[in-house]
Amino acid sequence: MLTYPQIDPVALAIGPLKIHWYGLMYLIGIGGAWLLASRRMKRFDPTWTKERLSDLVFWVACGVILGGRLGYVLFYNLDEYIANPTLIFEVWKGGMSFHGGLLGVMLAVWWFGKRHGKSFFQLMDFIAPLVPIGLGAGRIGNFINSELWGKVSDVPWAMVFPNGGPLPRHPSQLYQFALEGVALFVILWLFTRKPRPTASVSGLFVLCYGIFRFVVEFVRVPDAQLGYLAWGWLTMGQVLCVPMVLAGIALMVWAYRRDAAQPKAA
């Protein structure tokens, strides 16, 4: 059994103002994505400037935060937030949905593309390899918050979490960091080293994330207010990942078939 590192969720307190690690992880993720995007920007479009890139990152970040929070409210805990709507604004306590954040990003990208003459999938293919940076940072934030831990386990790396009871559990946040953050980043980075058909990068991202999240959900404790939705093992996260996997496969097939059907330059 490993010892859980006792980390104060508050990174910095200035009088009554408290800066939480969870929020800092979002800033780190957004900042890291911007730095990587600035390196890849000219390859995406030589006419782009840092100002246009910053504009894109800003709207995508808004989509992540607003979509992620509203997605959690709608998918995971609607009754509680209807009873006490002010809880929606307490984001430092956690409660973000990746699937809601993805929908928020899609809306932001669609709107941005309309303004700047880029197709939806051109922008999504550019953004997709950047997303694992934010996902990985977010999972570290979950770990510091001692939330979203896994089931009771006797594996050598199990941990006793401060608010997870006296028994050691799977550190499922770290599993998700390794898969959604590190592995997904490497897969997409290697895949995009060569030119790919439009929408194929987006398809690979959606497919891999759906698979990784579906697998980790087997050892992660579901949200208490929802529990298991069917057969004693199917969680809300898994329900939301099934259409992602199907959509990812469909997108990749469509992208490559569309590319093959286009006439090639002599």
Swiss-Prot record:
It is found in: Cell inner membrane. One of its GO terms (cellular component) is plasma membrane. Pfam families: LGT. Its main location: membrane. It is a multi-pass membrane protein. InterPro entries: Lgt. Belongs to the Lgt family. This is Phosphatidylglycerol--prolipoprotein diacylglyceryl transferase. It comes from Pseudomonas aeruginosa (strain ATCC 15692 / DSM 22644 / CIP 104116 / JCM 14847 / LMG 12228 / 1C / PRS 101 / PAO1). The lineage of its organism: Bacteria, Pseudomonadati, Pseudomonadota, Gammaproteobacteria, Pseudomonadales. The gene is lgt.
